Amino acid sequence: LRGGAQIGVQVDTLASAVHSGQFGGAAPDAAKALMRAIDSLSDEYGRTVIDGVDTTAEWSGQEYPAEAFRADAQLLEGTKIMGEDDPAGATPVANMVWSRPAITVTGFTSTPVSEAVNAVPATASAQLNLRVPAGADAAAIADAVCDHLRAHTPWGAHVKAEVLEANAGFATDPEKPAAALLGECLTEAYGTDTAAQGMGGSIPLTTELQEAHPNAEIALYGVEEPKCTIHSANESVDPTEIENIAA
């Protein structure tokens, strides 16, 4: 399970929005400045980059085939997976979703489209969701993201970046007795070998339980699959998933 953090960032460039006909072109647009800062968190192929943070780790478990990911994530036709166009070779999906930090823009505020006016925006803000691999220091990486945003916000714009919350990731040792027995049971029940994969979601309670009971072995069952679109407007779970895992 990945760890993560919520990061808030605000950019201000003007005392007030000013007429785009009179000042546009020379007056610094706060929305553009924030876009530039956020864009600097990705390389030219879309992979996450953060100043001072290693974003090149390799996943050692089961691979995540690109076509399976494309279907699971419901990419539109022609849309590229991040890192796919690197001339040196496509970056494995598993590296990016299970072994490296990832940053998603989960909210962005400037002038709403429905209220658009011919004025240069004076302020813009965003919320970023950071995910980090299990074992990484989520708080430290979140601080590095804030430092990165401050360093890469252009045109002398005033920027405020802060970590709103952070939580650690979690990983279990599949070689321990209970986990190994669970793997054997799953192999017997489903008639196929058990593979080691990442999950991506964050459940901070697991880390707290492990800290409180360091010798305990923790296993979780998830009943959702990609089509459940967890956290979206159309989130759902197929009841047969619950029936099958219980069986």
Where does each model-flagged region fall?
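Fold-level recognition of mixed alpha/beta catalytic cores in primary-metabolism enzymes, strongest
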Residues: 1-85, 94-101, 212, 234-243
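Short, glycine-/Ser/Thr-/acidic-enriched flexible segments
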Residues: 14-16, 110-112, 131-135, 166, ...
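A structural supersecondary motif
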Residues: 87, 91-119, 129
